[in-house]
UniProtKB/Swiss-Prot annotation:
Catalytic function, reaction form: thymidine + ATP = dTMP + ADP + H(+)
EC number of this enzyme: 2.7.1.21
Subunit structure: Homotetramer.
Main location class: cytoplasm
Protein family per UniProt: Belongs to the thymidine kinase family.
Entry annotated with the keyword Cytoplasm: yes
One Gene Ontology term, aspect cellular component: cytosol
Signal peptide: none
Subcellular location: Cytoplasm
UniProt-annotated binding residues for ATP: G15, S16, M17, F18, S19, G20, K21, S22, D88, E89, V90, Q91
Coiled-coil regions, chain positions: none
Protein name as catalogued: Thymidine kinase
Amino acid sequence: MYLINQNGWIEVICGSMFSGKSEELIRRVRRTQFAKQHAIVFKPCIDNRYSEEDVVSHNGLKVKAVPVSASKDIFEHITEEMDVIAIDEVQFFDGDIVEVVQVLANRGYRVIVAGLDQDFRGLPFGQVPQLMAIAEHVTKLQAVCSACGSPASRTQRLIDGEPAAFDDPIILVGASESYEPRCRHCHAVPTNKDK
């Protein structure tokens, strides 16, 4: 996909839920394995939707992953023979993830991260905007709006079938029962007084 060289770099895969971020990360990791490169995949411990030890896409593709509690724990699992470091659900990592990713790329690793670029309110999510700014390559994926069928760049959180309010908690790990992809026009975030 990108010109391969001996220097490290950062790739960010971002977009709304159900846009194929984990699927794309898995595809890139599998391609490196076909090329006889050594890859390791990480995920935050908080992400246990489908598996505690795998990154799993919504369509069922999976790859083995190391769950970590803190960004700097990633260093404990890196060895010299590694070529590619992949990190899924990067928005759930602590603020140190930007430094960790920078250090890994500066050491010569290809670093692939995937995550939500916006929270359910449509605002920048976690450290993803900073990672996008320092990345050599950014891939922004879109889903299909579950309301109208247009390209969807936002994630709609639903609570009992209704849009979540703006001041509801930001982090709530779920799947289709609590989130839907939406386009700009179908995305709704009421304030608590509107509910």
